[in-house]
Swiss-Prot record:
This is 5'-deoxynucleotidase YfbR. The gene is yfbR. Its EC number is 3.1.3.89. Substrate binds at residues 18-19, 33, 69, 77-80, 137. InterPro entries: HD/PDEase_dom (IPR003607), HD_domain (IPR006674), YfbR (IPR022971), YfbR/HDDC2 (IPR039356). Catalyzes the strictly specific dephosphorylation of 2'-deoxyribonucleoside 5'-monophosphates. Homodimer. GO terms for molecular function: 5'-deoxynucleotidase activity; metal ion binding; nucleotide binding. It catalyses: a 2'-deoxyribonucleoside 5'-phosphate + H2O = a 2'-deoxyribonucleoside + phosphate. Residues 30-142 form the HD domain. SUPFAM superfamilies: HD-domain/PDEase-like.
Length: 199
C-alpha cells in the first residue's frame, strides 16, 4: 500500500497562525479557526433548516467548513489586506489556492479521492453551501475581533469595522438569528457566562 502525506500535511495547519501582521493577545492558528468555522457553519445550516424553511445538509456544511482553509497548509495564510490589495492579486491568489487544493486532493489515495475532493475543492460547493461557509468564516473572524477588543487590544478595532461591513454584505436570516442569540455572550467574562449553569 502506498503511503499518503495528506493528513501529515493537514496536521500542520496548527502551525500556521492567522492575523500574522496584527499584534494578538492570543494567537489563533488555522486548525482551531477551522474547527470554530465548522461549528458555526453547522449552526447556521441548522438554523436555516429549522427556523427559515431551508433544506441544506448541515453535516456536509460542517465538513466543508472544516476543510475550507486546508490549502493554506501549502500556501500559508496571506493577510487579507495583501490578498485583496487589488483585483489582479486576488485573482492570482485564487489560482494559487486552486493549485494547492488540487495538490492536496492528489495526495489522497485514489480509492478515497472521490470522498475528499468535494470537501477540499471549493468549486464542488453549491452556491448555498459556499454562502454558509463564507458567512461562518466572517462571523468567526468577527468573534476573534470581539475577543481581542475585550482583552484591551485596540489593534482589532478597524478589522472589526471592516468585518461588520462584510457581515452586512453576507447578511441572512440565519446569521441575524446567530448574531442575536449567540454573539452577545462573547462580550461577557467567564464568570458571567457561567452564572446560569453551575456544575
Amino acid at each position: 500500500m502506498k503511503q499518503s502525506h495528506f493528513f501529515a500535511h493537514l496536521s500542520r495547519l496548527k502551525l500556521i497562525n492567522r492575523w500574522p501582521l496584527m499584534r494578538n493577545v492570543r494567537t489563533e492558528n488555522v486548525s482551531e479557526h477551522s474547527l470554530q468555522v465548522a461549528m458555526v457553519a453547522h449552526a447556521l445550516a441548522a438554523i436555516k433548516n429549522r427556523k427559515f424553511g431551508g433544506n441544506v445538509n448541515a453535516e456536509r456544511i460542517a465538513l466543508l467548513a472544516m476543510y475550507h482553509d486546508a490549502s493554506e497548509v501549502l500556501t500559508g495564510d496571506l493577510p487579507t489586506p495583501v490578498k485583496y490589495f487589488n483585483s489582479q492579486i486576488a485573482q492570482e491568489y485564487k489560482a494559487i489556492e486552486k493549485i494547492a487544493q488540487q495538490k492536496l486532493v492528489n495526495m489522497v489515495p485514489e480509492e478515497l479521492r472521490d470522498i475528499f475532493a468535494p470537501l477540499i475543492d471549493e468549486h464542488a460547493y453549491s452556491d448555498e453551501e459556499k454562502s454558509l461557509v463564507k458567512q461562518a468564516d466572517a462571523l468567526c473572524a468577527y468573534l476573534k475581533c470581539l475577543e481581542e477588543l475585550a482583552a484591551g487590544n485596540n489593534e482589532f478595532l478597524l478589522a472589526k469595522t471592516r468585518l461588520e461591513a462584510t457581515l452586512e454584505a453576507r447578511r441572512s436570516q440565519e446569521m441575524d438569528y446567530f448574531m442575536e442569540v449567540f454573539v452577545p455572550s462573547f462580550h461577557l467574562s467567564l464568570d458571567e457566562i457561567s452564572q446560569d449553569s453551575p456544575l
